[in-house]
């Protein structure tokens, strides 16, 4: 085994199967790139990202763990989000929630 190597079963892996999904259009109104990580509470991302923020409360990006999406200045794109699961409690980030969703 090589350090950091991941061994998986043959075939394609499906991530987040059965999770509640939401697709939103996001635009970077700022003058610098903004990168959002896989588990960041999307509701609390940089205010320069413009989208239907209230609709995204309790959601994160539907991407592979440990990866991110980068929004260049002036760029607009659609992203798919998935709902947080488990106890649905959020702490940290921009400190907008600090508890139950």
Curated annotation (Swiss-Prot):
Gene3D superfamilies: Urease, beta subunit. InterPro entries: Urease_beta-like, Urease_betasu_sf, Urease_subunit. GO terms for cellular component: urease complex. Keywords: Cytoplasm, Hydrolase. It catalyses: urea + 2 H2O + H(+) = hydrogencarbonate + 2 NH4(+). Pathway: Nitrogen metabolism; urea degradation; CO(2) and NH(3) from urea (urease route): step 1/1. Pfam families: Urease_beta (PF00699). Its EC number is 3.5.1.5. Heterotrimer of UreA (gamma), UreB (beta) and UreC (alpha) subunits. Three heterotrimers associate to form the active enzyme. This is Urease subunit beta. The gene is ureB.
């Amino acid at each position: 085994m090589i350090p950091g190597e991941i061994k998986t079963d043959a075939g394609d892996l499906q991530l987040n199967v059965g999770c509640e999904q939401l697709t939103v259009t996001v635009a970077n109104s700022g003058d610098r790139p903004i990168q959002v990580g896989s588990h960041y509470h999307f509701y609390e991302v940089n205010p320069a990202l413009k989208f239907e923020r209230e609709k995204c409360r309790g959601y994160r990006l539907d991407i592979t763990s440990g990866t991110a999406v980068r929004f260049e200045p002036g760029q607009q794109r659609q992203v798919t989000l998935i709902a947080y699961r488990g106890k649905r409690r959020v702490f940290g980030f921009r400190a907008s929630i600090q508890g139950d969703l």
